[in-house]
Amino acid sequence: MKLPVAVLVACAATVTASPSFADAKSEAKSQVEFGINVAQRGLWREAIYRWQKATELDPSYAAAYNDLAIAYEHEGQLDKARKAYEKAIELDPNNTQVRQNYELFKEINDRTTKAKEK
């Protein structure tokens, strides 16, 4: 049985307007802020945990993926960093900060790779 598009749109609007959705977005923001706080103190693994949690709570939160990418990069988890940057850009393609972070990440990794090949 096919549902009319209007019904599907109405259902989606109801879900996104529900308190649980709003609560998840709010909790995701809290997790990102907490992650920033602990990262500033050098607790990168805790920051990664918090930002992963934020992306689970709100999979559309581009800033959480950007922060997660930075933490992965700091911890030397470069494949994970690349994937997180790409996800952040996919979610927010016009975010110049994310794009700059990703371009710098690629530039540094390209230089490192070339240096290792010599």
What do these predicted regions represent?
Residues 28-29, 62-63, 96-97:
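Helix-start (N-cap) detector for alpha-helical repeat units in TPR-like alpha-solenoids
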Residues 53-56, 89-90:
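Conserved structural position within tetratricopeptide repeats
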